[in-house]
């Protein structure tokens, strides 16, 4: 079986402004490099029941985020996390990417998967954006695994308290 790359063109529409370290070129550089490897499977994010976001994040936070996407320009959710009109679809596709990765591995469509997404999703807390992250895609993945496949094994090589603070 092969490795899958799950990504969406909406990632480049999540704009953060000049000088911000989390830029569209982060994903385009990765995907352009990976396209040279012909043995990879390329796939798009899955559609998903957005209620899973409210199982990971406070309902008020999810509702606030959905109402916050500007029609034009940029808006700060916190001191680091910026959203733009294109962020709305990018956030949904980032979460849909982790769900597609899980389902693809579980259904043996591919051996493993890498999600090349923006905005990133591992620092957001239960009720606030943090560290460029709007939703905690990692916590959503954990929740989805527990609900759909009834197991979870998690190895986190960085500071784990963000994920654990959401999970418990």
Language-model features: where?
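HDAC/HDAC-like amidohydrolase catalytic core signature
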Residues: 1-156, 162
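Positively charged, low-complexity/disordered segments
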Residues: 160-161, 166-168
């Amino acid at each position: 079986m092969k490795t899958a790359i799950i990504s969406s063109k909406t990632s480049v529409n999540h704009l953060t402004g000049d000088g911000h370290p989390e830029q569209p070129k982060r994903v385009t550089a990765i995907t352009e490099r990976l396209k040279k490897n012909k043995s990879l499977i390329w796939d798009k994010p899955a559609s998903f029941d957005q209620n899973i976001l409210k199982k990971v994040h406070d309902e008020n936070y999810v509702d606030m985020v959905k109402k916050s996407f500007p029609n034009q320009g940029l808006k700060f959710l916190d001191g680091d996390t910026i959203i733009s009109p294109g962020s709305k679809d990018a956030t949904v596709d980032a979460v849909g990417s982790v769900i597609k990765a899980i389902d693809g591995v579980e259904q043996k469509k591919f051996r493993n998967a890498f999600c090349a997404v923006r905005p990133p999703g591992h620092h957001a807390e239960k009720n606030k954006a943090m560290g460029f992250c709007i939703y905690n895609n990692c916590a959503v993945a954990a929740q989805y695994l527990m609900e759909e496949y009834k197991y979870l094994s998690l190895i986190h090589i960085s500071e784990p308290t963000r994920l654990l603070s959401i999970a418990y």
